[in-house]
Amino acid sequence: MGELRGAHVPVLLERCLELLSPALDRTGQTGRTVYVDATLGLGGHAEAILTAHPRTMLVGLDRDTEALAHARVRLARFADRVHLEHAVYDELPDVLDRIGHPVVDGILFDLGVSSLQLDAPDRGFAYAQDAPLDMRMDQSRGVTAEEVVNSYSHPELARVLRVYGEEKFASRIASAIVRERDRAPITSSAQLAELVRQAIPAPARRTGGHPAKRTFQALRIEVNRELAALETALPAALDRLAIEGRMVVLSYHSLEDRLTKVALADRVRSKGPIDLPVELPGTGPTFRLLSRGAELPGEAEVAVNPRAASVRLRAAERLDPTQQQRQRTDRERYRRQVRAMHQPGTGSAVRRPVSGDDGTGTDEEGEGHDD
């Protein structure tokens, strides 16, 4: 286990605690709640949750064995409430079934590359450091970035850079990679970063940060199958939340945030026919959004933790179906009273019953209202 460089600052820690705490404060019949950190990393968020909620049990997942080792040390004082697993987040349902916690109360996804991985000089994630082209979050399995850049065809490389890096010079960069590897294999992050810099037109290099940023992001996503795993993991995680359970997702680029937005929007919309006067049982929203769109970090957060600059937070809570049914009944009773009022010979005033704001209203983009 390598030494950590600098202090680890969990991103949007106070906001995550604020959003997850209502779900973790409910102990129910078992006398405890279960919190899943699907991307445990160095355990900063988990430590804060366990400290604030002494009746909460942690299930922590991470594909990086080095991160798990650091987190195990950090969380040692909570050992009787901690269960750590070497797993990717799309394996969450299998993990929960195996350990006997099929339903949980809170889930956090803190996506992207971790501080440990960025700072480790031998992992190859950072374009500012010279290191072997590895980029695997789990160094025990999978292909490396070196294998990708030296074996993928030009069309395959261009697709990866264009789709996962949103790189507009994808084809030019892919051509430069193919030309260079024909002379000698590309083996280091510094070699690749310089190759990308030279492939991008000079005017474009002067804006948008380091020229290799998008290429390194794209290769990392390809190597670790990040988006494919996330697309599977988000709906599966929502399915495992208890009533009034909550999930928070921190994403760091538009592709992650888009998948999160789609997964949540699917659960906060009615599935019933739009032309029916009433909502059919089982077709209403099953979740409500806890944030208005994607929340951004404040200036103070970014000043303390510059790596939080690109974060986008989204959160949702599972609704109680019995409460939803009561609200549907109230709405139907009101409609009947209105119809009766407009019948010949009636003239009594109708007062609409007051129903609680369930926060399920969304626009076409899937955005909701503040909690």
Curated annotation (Swiss-Prot):
Signal peptide: none annotated. It is found in: Cytoplasm. S-adenosyl-L-methionine binds at G43, G44, H45, D62, L96, D110, Q117. One of its GO terms (molecular function) is rRNA (cytosine-N4-)-methyltransferase activity. The keyword Transmembrane does not apply. Its EC number is 2.1.1.199. GO terms for biological process: rRNA base methylation. It is an enzyme of class 2 (transferase). It catalyses: cytidine(1402) in 16S rRNA + S-adenosyl-L-methionine = N(4)-methylcytidine(1402) in 16S rRNA + S-adenosyl-L-homocysteine + H(+). InterPro entries: RsmH (IPR002903), SAM-dep_MeTrfase_MraW_recog (IPR023397), SAM-dependent_MTases_sf (IPR029063). Residues 315-371 are annotated as: Disordered. The keyword Cell cycle does not apply. Belongs to the methyltransferase superfamily. RsmH family. Specifically methylates the N4 position of cytidine in position 1402 (C1402) of 16S rRNA. NCBIfam families: 16S rRNA (cytosine(1402)-N(4))-methyltransferase RsmH. This is Ribosomal RNA small subunit methyltransferase H. It comes from Salinispora tropica (strain ATCC BAA-916 / DSM 44818 / JCM 13857 / NBRC 105044 / CNB-440). The lineage of its organism: Bacteria, Bacillati, Actinomycetota, Actinomycetes, Micromonosporales.
